Amino acid sequence: MLPRITHPIGRDSNCELADFFINIIYGLPATLFINHTIIESIAPDVIIGGKNRTSSRAFYGQTIHELSHASHFSQVGSAYWAKYISYIMTYGAYGDDNKGENAGICGVGEMWGYAIEDLLTNDKYGGLDIHKGADWIRADILHDLMKEGIVSPNDVFDCLTPLITTQNKLKEALQAKSPANHNIIETRFDTLNNN
């Protein structure tokens, strides 16, 4: 999705002075490189990392995971995704235990990515592989809600809007989407907050 990012990306921590200087050296050139080079016109929207994927199941799962991010991007757009990328640039792929600027955006994105990856991969290949992601992401919660039919993948996808910037906001959107299951959704997401 990098070719489609039109908003600035860069380091975004709690130290504004450090971020300023780092972004002059790192963030600004990265944004300009993405938006004003050949990357903009020929880079693929999705890159599937095949390294260390030694089975069809693993490659299929990785493909589903990355395509789930592409579907999420289609819902939220460039400004939201620039915050996601900036979080990863600042804190690493899964960050630091739901801390830092835009951690919630990463949590929602990875929760969706791993949950749909596991749901579809397990449906195709059988078995029960469930990724939590980092401990604070807890994709298993969303996976179980979908697997048990409490919410559908379409329900979750419909909730992935630019307003959903934390897992708690995702919970509230799912409760509004499925009011009959309000308490079940609340209970499942409570396990997220208690870990």
Language model regions located:
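Post-HEXXH active-site segment of zinc metalloproteases
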Residues: 74-105
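Auxiliary, metal-adjacent structural segments of Zn-dependent hydrolase domains
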Residues: 1-43
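Short pre-active-site segment immediately N-terminal to the catalytic Zn-binding motif
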Residues: 46-63, 104
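Pan-zinc metallopeptidase signature
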Residues: 126-195
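Active-site recognition of the HExxH zinc-binding catalytic motif
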Residues: 61-78, 110-114
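Surface-exposed patches in mature extracellular/periplasmic domains of secreted proteins
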Residues: 1-7, 24, 79-84, 124-133, ...
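Metalloprotease/metallohydrolase-associated module, dominated by Zn2+-dependent proteases
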Residues: 94-150
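Solvent-exposed loop/turn segments at secondary-structure junctions
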Residues: 10, 29-30, 52-55, 69-70, ...
